[in-house]
């Protein structure tokens, strides 16, 4: 049953802290989670405040306040007394006030625990993850949770409670009944408080009293509660005297498994007398009694170093007293050890000491005061590998480690001084002193032994702006050699000594160079030496500061706004690297693309440049300055000023029309700014579509080809021009049409009707594709079988689709084909139709002479009957078996034949054919651009030749017709020199066209180069400084005409010629400023000089002007007005001059403070009595002129400010005192004052000096005096003592009119006179603010009245 206990809340009895005899806060019972006292290794540090607690001296009630610290990301659930539950999201410090003595229970999520921490007198419950788990069996009885009712007792001495330090022995279950102590006679009555608990530490091998059950399983919650109790004892026993106290029992929960962590290093000898009580174990139903036992607990403390990993064996000797059934009063006399490490325990420190306990139960002496002894002895090791739950990586604080020795030493002295308690008697005091002495000696010896891996604090050297060198030395003791393997971890923090550290180096070296540091930054270092996972040591934290340097390069400036003549820029500051940025330096290229020059220097983060050119590119870069110097420049930012929208361009022109495309070209509009880049948008609308214009091209080119159009279709076009400012107006609309395509070939022709011997009708259909246009004509071609050359001839050309061909011959085969023609061209021929004309019967035959006698077996033929005068023959025939086969009829056939007359004799006529093939033409070069072509006459083939056709071209397969006529010679002109040409000839007669003859080839001879096609001026190639004496030109290389170009002749000015090599750019130098030159060029090759190109006119710019004289016309204490040059009434472009005024800054560099055409400028925001240096520079279109000499001007001293109106105080009947405010000296110069009085229209100076008051007497009665004062600044110069006066103050009125008493006749005058005087004084002293406020109130009243009137009128 003891292993199945449910995790319920346990009650931890607290103590009552008392400081300086006054109660601090009576602690009530805590209701905490059972896991509240578990130790968490990832908590950074828990500081325990050490207090001295004494008995109560006066009655006083206090409330218990507990702060629950909730980590980020966690949720705290609190259940109040009324049953309500509240969730609190971390991070937060939740104060819990318990005036009734019971805090609400805190429910924790699984895997978390609560830990009580006391910092600066405030107890906190820290919610942390549960990370440690102990499994070491210990003999102890398992008890059910029992909450004892609080009893009214006196305040008790500090209890034996220990802080939850890792590595300590847990608290086993030991229950005592609460006892009451009668009030002491020497103390006043105190309020009764709940009892405290006594915790006795027992070894799992101890001998239990009769009736007590031995359990080997411990509850983990008990361990945590025990650690909490040990922490509380340690916090309350520091520096205290031995105090008698009563211990009350505490109900603890035990579980089956628990470890035995090492005991604390600060255990001190003490004696505990237990009170009688009864303990009942529900799991075993055993009852045992401890009523008759008085226990004396003796603790032997032997400190050990935890780093050695050699735990001690804790031995407890228990002796049962023989005096049974004698209840006793339990007291505890505590004598504290003097070890320097016994009073401070930090959960983050990895070195702990272990002690050995001997508990001896002795019978009470006559005085019922238990004795306390302390023995210092070492115990043999029991466990070889004691678990050390503390990790150096879980929040170890080296600063605490470094300060342990000093704090411990101070606390040791305090504890030794507090160890003499007058309440300890006789033997017990002596035993305690001897025990403390021996323990102190042992602890002193242990403290003098060095750690096995102690290292000195790291040394930082060679500290640079962004790097530093860190080195350290390591030590060793006798147990470990310094040469043994070890690892060093160097951790760096930049957010404070207790901030987050980051490991930047791990290795066995002792010197590390740090890189990538930030300038002017404080860094903290610590070194951890690791031998293995259980032996670590941390050095003291060392801090160093990197020096400052110049700022980081800032980001490039950004554009706020722009106009045609201005640009507004802004920028952000970069890292100042330890010194505040004093100014920014903005440079620009002035729109020329050359070297950068300063345009602004100051602290502002924005700047606006004026008087810029429209649509111009400007480049900027930025640098920052501080006391260390100037940073590098930022990246270059490019901005453009605004400009005008371009004018409307001309309509686009048709460059070439295709079947499915149109090529257009256009000209750029007249652009006033040549630097402006134009973009063009071409829009198109298909005619009769009604869809409107749609963009088809967007780019910077001046040509465009639109494809995928429909053939023989009309389209509309217009064009826009764009620049950075917007779109121009559209150009005029133009219409262009795509070309039609050649028609498709017609279908195969067909025969209409019957084929006759001499005629046939041929028909054909329309082609399926007419190419987008109507067919204009059809052509029918025929080819006879008799033509071995298979020549086609056109027999018909027209618009009809049927043709009667009546020039046929009987028994002849013909081939026919047809093609059609449209305005787009000629189609391909159709498929071939083959026909054969039938044979004709003979009309008459001539009798052939017979040779010899013949005998005819045929019957006699009857007489022929003539039909239409011709004999008729009757023939019976059969159908031929095959095509074109005739069968003769036998004379014995039944059919009778009639014989015709004899035929006539005739002669044969030869057939006519196209001409034969021509021969190869003969080519003769007449010159580089002329060739004579001649050829011979071919055979005519029965028909006279009427024409010759000559084809000519540069490619043999692509020649074109250049001549048609009867001549046998043709002269070709306009040829290109040094070029190869091809030609051929064919003859034509009335029958047809003959075949082409052979192809001839000729190459024209070379000659002088062609004329240079393009010559233009290039202004960008000439620097601005040389533009007055130089002109740059560029040209395109012409055709060389068969001989490479070797150079060029450039003619300029008064027929001056410069010969250059084969280049296309040249700069003419040593020209006259502001002069126009006519320039032309010719090319040179082996054959000679080419013609001159068309001339161009170029003008040099005038020389840059000289700087004018700079003068200062107005001196001020904060400004200087400068003037230079003269103002011209007529400003033309030729004499337009800008001026640059430069001023020296703190670094000695001159920067531009004004740029423009004005001749005056006021420099403001200057310091008084300071010398400033200036330069001036004149600029025109030729560039910037030379800078002038340095001009030095000094500002004046600043005058004092105006004083308030003086105050007049009458002294007696004939004198008054005038007072005014005083001013502090200005930069060490004394202040003097001048008092002036005005009577009527006359003003007199009545005082001048350093005083602030003056007595005025002997004034006239019935007069008005006005006093005003001004301050002056007195200083010395080489000319002597000088005075600089400020403005006068407002005047103060003083009236000397006599006033009569109120009961007399002049009482009315007195009142009136007073009223007038006050009114006049108020009028005089009314300030500007009062006047403005009066006006505002008046306007407000008028507005309200108007609003009321308007509303009233509208409602009515």
From Swiss-Prot:
UniProt KW keywords: Membrane, Repeat, Transmembrane, Transmembrane helix
Membrane topology: Single-pass membrane protein
Positions of the Fibronectin type-III domain: 454-549, 553-648, 650-741, 745-842, 914-1007, 1017-1103, 1104-1199, 1202-1299
Regions of compositional bias (Polar residues) in chain numbering: 370-393, 825-838
CDD domains in UniProt: FN3
Gene3D superfamilies: Immunoglobulins
Recorded family membership: Belongs to the FNDC3 family.
InterPro entries in the cross-refs: FN3_dom (IPR003961), FN3_sf (IPR036116), Ig-like_fold (IPR013783), Striated_Muscle_Regulatory (IPR050964)
Localization, UniProt: Membrane
Cytoplasmic membrane side: 1351-1356
A GO cellular-component term linked to this record: membrane
Lineage: Eukaryota, Metazoa, Chordata, Craniata, Vertebrata
Bilayer-spanning residue ranges: 1330-1350
Residue ranges, compositional bias (Basic and acidic residues): 439-448, 883-894
Full protein name: Fibronectin type III domain containing protein 3C1
Region span, Disordered: 303-341, 356-402, 428-452, 825-894, 1299-1320
PANTHER family for the chain: FIBRONECTIN TYPE-III DOMAIN-CONTAINING PROTEIN, TITIN
Composition-biased stretches (Low complexity): 308-341
Pfam families linked to this entry: fn3
Domain of life: Eukaryota
């Amino acid at each position: 049953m003891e292993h199945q206990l449910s995790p319920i809340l346990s009650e931890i009895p607290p103590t009552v802290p008392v400081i300086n005899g006054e109660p601090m806060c009576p602690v009530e019972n805590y209701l905490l989670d059972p896991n509240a006292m578990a130790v968490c290794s990832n908590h950074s540090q828990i500081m325990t405040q050490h207090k001295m607690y004494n008995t109560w001296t006066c009655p006083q009630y206090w409330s218990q306040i507990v702060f629950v610290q909730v980590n980020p990301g966690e949720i705290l659930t609190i259940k109040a007394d009324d049953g309500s539950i509240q969730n609190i999201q971390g991070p937060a410090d939740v104060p819990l006030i318990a005036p009734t003595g019971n805090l609400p229970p805190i429910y924790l999520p699984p895997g978390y625990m609560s830990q009580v921490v006391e910092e600066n007198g405030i107890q906190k419950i820290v919610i942390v993850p549960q990370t440690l788990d102990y499994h070491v069996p210990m003999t102890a009885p398992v008890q059910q949770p029992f909450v004892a009712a609080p009893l009214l007792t006196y305040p008790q001495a500090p209890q034996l409670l220990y802080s939850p330090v890792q590595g300590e022995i847990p608290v086993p279950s030991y229950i005592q009944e609460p006892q009451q102590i009668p009030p002491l006679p020497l103390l006043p009555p105190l309020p009764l408080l709940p009892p405290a608990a006594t915790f006795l530490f027992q070894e799992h091998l101890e001998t239990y009293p009769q009736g007590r059950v031995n359990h080997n399983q411990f509850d983990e919650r008990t361990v945590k509660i025990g650690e909490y109790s040990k922490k509380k004892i340690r916090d309350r026993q520091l520096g205290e005297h031995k105090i008698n106290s009563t211990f009350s029992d505490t109900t603890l929960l035990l579980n089956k498994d628990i470890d035995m962590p090492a005991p604390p290093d600060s255990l001190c000898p003490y004696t505990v007398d237990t009170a009688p009580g009864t303990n009942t174990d529900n799991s075993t139903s055993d009852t045992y009694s401890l009523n008759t036992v008085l226990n004396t607990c003796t603790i032997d403390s032997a400190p050990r170093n935890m780093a050695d990993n050699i735990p001690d064996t804790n031995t407890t000797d228990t002796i049962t007293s023989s005096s049974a059934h004698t209840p006793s009063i339990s007291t505890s006399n505590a004598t504290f050890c003097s070890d320097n490490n016994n009073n401070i325990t930090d959960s983050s420190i990895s070195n702990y000491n272990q002690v050995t306990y001997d508990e001896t139960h002795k019978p009470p002496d006559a005085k019922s005061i238990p004795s306390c002894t302390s023995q210092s002895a070492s115990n043999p090791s029991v466990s070889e590998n004691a678990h050390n739950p503390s990790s150096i990586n879980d929040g170890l604080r080296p600063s605490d480690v470094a300060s342990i020795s000093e704090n411990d030493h101070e606390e040791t002295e305090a504890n030794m001084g507090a160890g003499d308690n007058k309440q300890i008697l006789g033997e017990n005091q002596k035993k305690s002193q001897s025990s403390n002495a021996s323990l102190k000696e042992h602890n002193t010896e242990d403290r003098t032994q060095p750690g096995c891996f102690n290292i000195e604090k790291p040394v930082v050297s060679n500290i640079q702006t962004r790097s530093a060198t860190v080195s350290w030395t390591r030590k060793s003791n006798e147990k470990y050699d310094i040469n043994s393997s070890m690892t060093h971890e160097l951790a760096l923090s930049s957010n404070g000594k207790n901030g987050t550290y980051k490991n930047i180096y791990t290795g066995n070296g002792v010197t590390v160079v740090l890189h990538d540091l930030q300038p002017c930054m404080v860094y903290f270092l610590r070194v951890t030496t690791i031998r293995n996972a259980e032996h670590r040591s941390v050095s003291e934290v060392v801090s160093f500061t990197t020096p400052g340097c110049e700022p980081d390069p800032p980001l490039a400036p950004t554009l706020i706004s722009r106009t045609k003549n201005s640009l507004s820029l802004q920028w952000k500051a970069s890292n100042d690297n330890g010194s505040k940025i004093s100014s920014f330096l903005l440079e620009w290229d002035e729109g020329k693309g050359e070297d950068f020059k300063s345009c602004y220097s100051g602290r502002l983060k924005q700047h606006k440049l004026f008087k810029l050119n429209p649509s111009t590119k400007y480049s900027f870069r930025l640098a920052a300055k501080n006391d260390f110097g100037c940073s590098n420049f930022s990246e270059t930012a490019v901005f453009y000023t605004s400009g005008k929208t371009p004018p409307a361009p001309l309509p686009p022109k048709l460059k070439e029309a295709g079947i499915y495309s149109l090529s257009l070209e256009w000209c750029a509009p007249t652009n006033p700014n040549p630097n402006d880049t134009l973009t063009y948008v071409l829009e198109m609308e298909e005619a009769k579509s009604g869809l409107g214009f749609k963009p088809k091209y967007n780019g910077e080119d001046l040509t465009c080809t639109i494809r995928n159009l429909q053939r023989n279709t009309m389209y509309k076009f217009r064009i826009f021009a764009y620049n950075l400012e917007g779109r121009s107006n559209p150009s005029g609309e133009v219409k262009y049409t795509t070309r039609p395509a050649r028609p498709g070939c017609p279908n195969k022709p067909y025969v209409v009707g019957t084929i006759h011997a001499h005629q046939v009708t041929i028909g054909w259909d329309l082609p399926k594709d007419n190419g987008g246009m109507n067919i204009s004509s059809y052509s029918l071609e025929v080819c006879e079988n008799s033509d071995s050359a298979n020549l086609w001839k056109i027999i018909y050309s027209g618009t009809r689709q049927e043709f009667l061909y009546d020039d046929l011959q009987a028994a002849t085969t013909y081939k026919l084909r047809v093609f059609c023609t449209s305005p787009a061209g000629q189609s391909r021929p159709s498929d071939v139709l083959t026909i054969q004309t039938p044979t004709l019967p003979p009309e008459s035959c001539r009798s052939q002479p017979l040779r010899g006698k013949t005998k005819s077996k045929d019957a006699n033929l009857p007489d022929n009957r003539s039909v239409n005068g011709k004999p008729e023959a009757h023939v019976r025939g059969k159908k031929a078996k095959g095509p074109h086969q005739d069968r003769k009829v036998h004379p014995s056939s039944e059919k009778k034949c009639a014989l015709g007359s004899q035929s006539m004799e005739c002669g044969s006529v030869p057939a006519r054919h196209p001409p034969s093939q021509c021969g190869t033409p003969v080519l003769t070069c007449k010159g580089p651009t002329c060739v004579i072509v001649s050829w011979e006459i071919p055979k005519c083939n029965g028909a006279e030749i009427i024409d010759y056709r000559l084809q000519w071209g540069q490619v043999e397969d692509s020649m074109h017709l250049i001549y048609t006529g009867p001549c046998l010679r043709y002269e070709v002109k306009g040829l290109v020199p040094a070029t190869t040409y091809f030609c051929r000839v064919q003859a034509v007669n009335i029958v047809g066209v003959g075949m082409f003859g052979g192809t001839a080839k000729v190459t024209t001879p070379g000659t002088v180069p062609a004329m240079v096609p393009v010559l233009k001026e290039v202004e960008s190639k000439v620097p601005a400084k040389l533009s007055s004496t130089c002109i740059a030109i560029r040209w395109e290389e012409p055709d060389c005409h068969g001989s490479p170009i070797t150079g060029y002749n450039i003619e300029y000015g008064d027929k001056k010629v410069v010969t250059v090599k084969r280049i296309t750019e040249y700069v003419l130098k040593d020209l006259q400023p502001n002069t126009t030159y006519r320039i032309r060029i010719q090319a040179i090759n082996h054959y000679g000089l080419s013609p001159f190109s068309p001339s161009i006119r170029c003008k040099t710019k005038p020389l840059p002007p000289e700087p004018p004289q700079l003068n200062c016309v107005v001196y001020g204490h904060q400004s200087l007005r400068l003037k230079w040059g003269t103002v011209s009434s007529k400003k033309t472009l030729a004499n337009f001059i800008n001026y640059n005024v430069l001023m020296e800054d703190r670094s000695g560099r001159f920067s531009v403070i004004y740029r423009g055409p004005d001749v005056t400028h006021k420099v403001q925001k200057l310091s008084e009595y300071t010398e400033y240096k200036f330069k001036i520079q004149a600029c025109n279109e030729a560039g910037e002129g030379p800078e002038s000499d340095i001009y030095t001007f000094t500002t004046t001293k600043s005058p004092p400010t105006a004083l308030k109106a003086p105050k007049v105080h009458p002294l007696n009947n004939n004198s008054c005192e005038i007072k005014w405010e005083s001013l502090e000296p200005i930069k060490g110069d004394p202040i003097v004052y001048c008092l002036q009085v005005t009577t009527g229209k006359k003003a007199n100076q009545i005082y001048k000096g350093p005083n602030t008051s003056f007595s005025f007497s002997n004034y006239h009665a019935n007069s008005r005096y006005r006093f005003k004062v001004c301050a002056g600044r007195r200083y010395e110069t080489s000319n002597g003592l000088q005075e600089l006066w400020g403005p006068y103050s407002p005047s103060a009125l003083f009236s000397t009119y006599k006033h009569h008493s109120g009961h007399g006749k002049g009482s009315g005058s007195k009142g009136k006179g007073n009223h007038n005087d006050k009114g006049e004084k108020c009028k005089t002293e009314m300030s500007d603010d009062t006047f403005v406020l009066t006006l505002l109130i008046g306007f407000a009243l008028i507005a309200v009245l108007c609003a009321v009137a308007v509303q009233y009128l509208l409602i009515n």
